[in-house]
Amino acid sequence: MSYQWDNKKPTAQMLGRWQPFHDGHYALFEEIIKKTGQVCIQIRDVQGVDDNPFDFETVKKKIEERLNPKYEGRFKIILVPNITNICYGRRDGYKIEEIVMPEEIQKI
């Protein structure tokens, strides 16, 4: 059975540069998807800034190649501005969680 993305369904957010998308990011994704069953991956628009050589389409393609075999339809990838601050007022229907990965994953 194939999964179909549903914008109304609770969704986890995964924000980053993904320069490049590596095994640590994949392991993090596998933990995050357990939260809601689908993940919105946000790629920060940082190409050409500091050590970020890859453009959005390249990063998106690499993520899709890695995730589609197991998770096709369960993630959406979007380009966002170079978000550096995440701010909130009152929490109204969402959680902010840090996913702490094992040390060997964090070293990747």
Residue positions per predicted region:
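Nucleotidyltransferase catalytic core that binds NTPs
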Residues: 1-108
